Amino acid sequence: MMNETSMIEAARSLAWLSWSSIEKNEIDQESLIAERMWRRVLTRPIKENERQLLLDLFENQKSQFRSDPKQRDEFLGIGQWQIPNQSELSDEQRSELAAWSFTARSLWMLSEALTQY
C-alpha cells in the first residue's frame, strides 16, 4: 500500500498543500508544516515528541534527496498528479517537497491513520 502510485500522489498532494500554504516569513516553518499534515491525516493535535519524530524524518529525507537529485526527481515524478509549476522551483525547494512527500506518506501508514475510518 505504501508504494502504490495513488498513495504517493496523495502524500505529494498533502505535502504541497501544507508547504505552499505557509507564509515564507513564518518562524519555524517546518514545525507548522508538520503540524498541518498531522492534523489533516489524524485530525488531532500533534504532541511534541510526535512533531520531533516527523521533523527528524523530514530532515533525514531532505538530506538524502539533496545528495541524490535523480532519486528526488524520480520520486516527485511518480503518477499523474504533479506539483504545480515544479520546473520553476529551486533544487532546494524540490528536495524539501520530496522530503515532505515522503514524510506525509509515512503519516498515512500509521496504524492510527489506517484504523481511523
Give residue ranges: language-model regions:
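Substrate/cofactor-recognition hotspot
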Residues: M1-Y117
